Amino acid sequence: MESEKSASGDEQRPSHAPAAPASPLAAGEFEILILSLPEAAARRRLVHAQLDFPGMPSYRVLEAVDGRALDERALAAGYDEQAAIRHCGRPLTRPEIGCAMSHLAAYRTMLERNLPLALVMEDDALIGLHAMQVLRRLVRMIDPSRPEVVLLSRVGRTSAWGGRKVDRNHRLYRVHGANGAYGYLITQAAARTMLQALHPVRTPADDWRHLMRARIVQVFALVPYCIGIAALGENSHIGEDRFEAEGARTVGRWLRKYAYQKFIFQLFVKPLLRLRKHASTW
């Protein structure tokens, strides 16, 4: 099925995507916001191949920001380099900046369209076989007025304390360590607080630990996860530059991290929080 273009330039599914709703979606429903660069034709084909079916939620493809193409004026308006250095110990790479701006644009779309909940996905996300059935159960458990994010991708660790049952096979746990922003549910309240806290950009889009520590949002994970990453996602627009930037961090910073992981984390944090590590299953 070929998608149309909205007035804003975003693609939207003709048979399902409603025009700016004045009232929230029905209980158990949500809209999907896909972030994709205009030239990412193969990735967009993957999106349509997964979502262009009767009974699937409405979705729209939002034009992502290519950080490599930003001019100096746009960069100065949307990115705070000094804040990034204070927070991350280094400037963000251009692809990281573009990615973070793209996710903030998705949050603005949520507020403009009065969406109580949205599933934000990057265009290399791979949706699990029964994901939508699980998500329709899950969204009924979420209060849109609370600033909450639920990661649907694989996470590093979760705490076993206070897990909530979603269905016979899935539970919701608090996140302790996670990277990646290619598939997550977000409430309208979380979109609002993240826009206020993260603009101009000063952290990567997937710095969930910072968001939790700063009490900007609460972050949970669905276990087992229901959104993976396609093979084409290995050729990330962000990955290589990010790894090079991470490698440039000071020796002292790495030594402090090593000491924490080797001693404090293993002896105190891990047993106290009953942390569980999650392996890749698909």
Q: Which residues does each PLM region occupy?
A:
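An acidic/histidine-cluster motif and surrounding catalytic segment
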Residues: 2-121, 125-282
